[in-house]
Each structure stands twice: as C-alpha cells, then as structure tokens.
From Swiss-Prot:
One of its GO terms (molecular function) is 3-oxoacyl-[acyl-carrier-protein] synthase activity. It is an enzyme of class 2 (transferase). One of its GO terms (biological process) is fatty acid biosynthetic process. It is found in: Cytoplasm. Residues 258-262 are annotated as: ACP-binding. Its main location: cytoplasm. Belongs to the thiolase-like superfamily. FabH family. InterPro entries: ACP_syn_III_C (IPR013747), ACP_syn_III_N (IPR013751), FabH (IPR004655), Thiolase-like (IPR016039). Pfam families: ACP_syn_III (PF08545), ACP_syn_III_C (PF08541). Homodimer. This is Beta-ketoacyl-[acyl-carrier-protein] synthase III. Gene3D superfamilies: 3.40.47.10. Catalyzes the condensation reaction of fatty acid synthesis by the addition to an acyl acceptor of two carbons from malonyl-ACP. Catalyzes the first condensation reaction which initiates fatty acid synthesis and may therefore play a role in governing the total rate of fatty acid production. Possesses both acetoacetyl-ACP synthase and acetyl transacylase activities. Its substrate specificity determines the biosynthesis of branched-chain and/or straight-chain of fatty acids.
Length: 330
C-alpha cells in the first residue's frame, strides 16, 4: 500500500466531459438480449454515453481538461505535467497524455499515461501529489478518460450493459485556491488480475486479418469482482479515515466509483454511512472506469450536492486488482 500524507496539495479545478450520443437501456433492448428491467434491477444503470465515430479518448480528455483549466483560472501554457489515467488509450504509442498536450497547445510538459483501470483518478491524485512534493512549482493536469464502448462484446449482456465513455480532469498545485487533498491511499493485488481483463496487448496480440476474439473485449468475473470490490473499498476507506483521526461522521459526502448500485450500497453499509450522503450518478453515465470519480465530482458540484466546506471521501476499485481512497476538503 502506498500513501501520500503531510504534503500540501490543492486540487484547483475540475472538469468533465461526456459525449452527446446517449445509449439507453431501451436502445440496448434492440440489439442485446436484455431488458431495461433486467439492467436496472441488477446495476442501477439506465443509460450511458458513447463517443461518436472519429472521436477518441484523447478528445474527451481534452474537453474535460479545458473545463478544469477554466475552473482553476489557468491557461494551458502554465501546465508543467500532464498525467492521464486510462485503460482504453488512443494508441499503445504515442501515449494519450501527449495527444492531449498537443491538442491543448502545451509545449514541453512532462506527459505520460498510466493504467489503474477504475482506480485511475485516485492513483493519479497520489502521483500528482508526489510530483508537487518533489517540485513545488509544478502545475499538474490530471486527466482520466475512457472509450470503453469500443472494447465491449455486444453479445455479452453481463458486461456490455455496464460501461460508458467519458472523461474527467483536475489541476493540482502546491498552493492556491481549491480543495485540500488531505490524504490518499492506494493498493493492489495482482493475483486478482484475471477477474477483469481487456486483451489486445502482447499477451493476446492480433495481426491484420485475424478474427477478433472475445479476449479482445472486456471480460469480467462479476461475482468475484463484487466480493473483492466491496471488501477492499470499505477497508481502504476505513484506513484513510483512521490514519487521519477521523470517522465516517466527519465526512459530509462519499463519492465512490460508479460501477454498480449494489456495490455502492454494500460499501455504504459497511462504512455505516446513510444513503443520502453517498453520491450516485451511474444511472446517467454507467461505469466510465477511470473517469467515473472525477465525472461524479464535477456532477455533484454542478448539482449543488458538493459545496464549499465539505469533506469528501473518494473510494475506488478497478482491474489489476487496484483500489484506493482519498480525502478532499472543499
């Protein structure tokens, strides 16, 4: 487990982007063997957004980044680092962060991708904080973007109904206005990697003309993912609270990874937090993986649910297996 603590760090701007195209459960009924009732009762999801043809993960990240920069009152040229969380990059090389950097007109920044799946944003906060600790003058743009609908097997109703496309972004600096990043914890267990996979890497390479196999798409052992997700999200949330001398009563709002309503409810039960203090928007966006948490933060602010003065607990889990938690004081 890695931790970042006692390092002054401000999350100054937030932005989120979701594509215009909306795919409802009723739309899915037309070409997937499923129903709105089946999806809603098992997941809580009613719709998800889908990138248009020719639109990629870097495009979504760029739009979210522009909004985050505007929210922070900063110009792209002030950014020194671009770090991007994704498991659905535009290419294996160049990295998506470099593409975002170019689209924003940034020159000379350090830019790289990383993959912590659905835990990406919280992992990114940990990395951004470490960068700021080493270089107090750093101004870090953190993006989290996914184009998951490009990697779904539409014949597998257990996975294709879950995911959507979108992006979120934040600007992190040592000083200035914005939410105080009080603490962040991240952990993983590679022994659980087989529970949630997306193929197409060197383990499952594809040559031109090869038929696309099922292992190219999202594959998931839903039952085991549920069990480990609930256990680890709750445990690391309790850990980050305890190490800061806090209890769940000191948290005004919990923003969990928006994967499945049953998972969110089970984590809330374990933490002993009432449902009205847990932010949920997966019915609108589905599971957007790394983009889920920053998208939820931006949405909660826009809806007036997240207000200045509130302490927020972020809790995530994802393929790898990865998980993390962070405390933000707005």
């Amino acid at each position: 487990m890695t931790a970042s603590r006692d390092i002054a760090c401000r999350v100054r701007g937030f932005g989120a982007y979701t594509p215009v195209d909306v795919l409802t459960n009723f739309d899915l009924e037309k070409f997937v063997e499923t129903t709105d009732e089946w999806i809603t009762t098992r997941t809580g999801i009613r719709q998800r957004h889908r990138l248009a043809e020719g639109q990629n993960a870097s495009d979504a990240a760029t739009e979210a980044a522009r909004l985050a920069l505007a929210d922070a009152g900063m110009e792209p040229g002030e950014i020194t680092h671009v770090i991007n969380a994704t498991c659905t990059p535009d290419y294996l090389c160049p990295n998506t962060a470099c593409l975002v950097e170019a689209k924003l007109g940034i020159m000379g920044a350090m830019a790289f991708d990383f993959n912590a799946a659905c835990s990406g944003y919280v992992y990114g906060l940990s990395m951004a904080r470490a960068i700021v600790a080493a270089q107090p003058e750093a101004r870090v743009l953190l993006t989290a973007t996914e184009a998951l609908t490009r990697r779904l097997n539409w014949a597998d109703r257990t996975t294709c109904v879950l995911f959507g496309d979108g992006a979120g972004a934040s600007v992190i600096t040592a000083e200035g206005e914005g939410a105080l990043l009080e603490d962040v914890l991240c952990a993983s267990d590679g022994n659980l990697g087989g529970l949630l996979t997306i193929g197409g890497g060197t383990h499952t390479p594809y040559a031109k003309g090869d038929p696309v196999g099922e292992d190219f798409f999202v594959q998931m052992n839903g039952r085991d993912v549920f069990k480990h997700a609930v256990r680890n999200m709750a445990a690391i949330s309790q850990d980050v609270l305890a190490r800061n001398g806090l209890t769940i009563d000191d948290v005004a709002l919990v923003i969990p990874h928006q994967a499945n309503l049953r998972i969110i409810e089970a984590v809330g039960d374990r933490l002993g937090v009432p449902a009205e203090r847990v932010f949920v928007n997966l019915h609108e966006f589905g599971n957007t993986s790394a983009a889920s948490v920053p998208l939820a933060i931006a949405d909660a602010r826009a809806k007036g649910v997240l207000r200045p003065g509130m302490r927020v607990l972020l809790a995530t889990f994802g393929g790898g297996f990865t998980w993390g938690a962070a405390l933000l004081h707005f």
